[in-house]
Amino acid sequence: IGMIENSTTGALESFNFEQLQKHIPELHKFNFPIDTYQFNPPMDSSDMEPDMWRKLVRIIHENYDKYQGFVILHGTDTMAYTASALSFMLDGLNKPVILTGSQLPIEVLRTDGKENLMTSIEIAVARNKEDKAVVPEVCIYFENHLMRGNRTTKINAENFNAFRSSNFPI
């Protein structure tokens, strides 16, 4: 989701997430504010390591009382590893932490990123009649599937249906 094509070189580059609503104008239709936080410099998910997991956990803890849920945009290379690590590091969580991404850059006409992000946000704020989070755990949402963070593996590097939770789906 976080990559756009450089029109001069054709290379994929990260973009400023404060510009996210420019690429997904439908985000304006939500009746609540959407705040963003971006690591500087942005990180390629293939370089993800435990120190970054600790940083994500710290950000969630520092902002826990401000939000109903959290959505983490993540590259697909190591998304399943990050989701699993966060699920154990955030033990006792009572709010959704939804990881999502895309197989195609956000500015591509048929990108899967828009649907993945929009649905992830909806899941992150979903509440039941008792005003409790519907999904109070770390999950991955990808291509119409919501999967437990610590039970998901990447099965395909090219297809939209890139992840699976074979043994313990939601």
Kindly label every feature range from the protein language model.
Residues 1-170:
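Active-site histidine-anchored catalytic micro-motif
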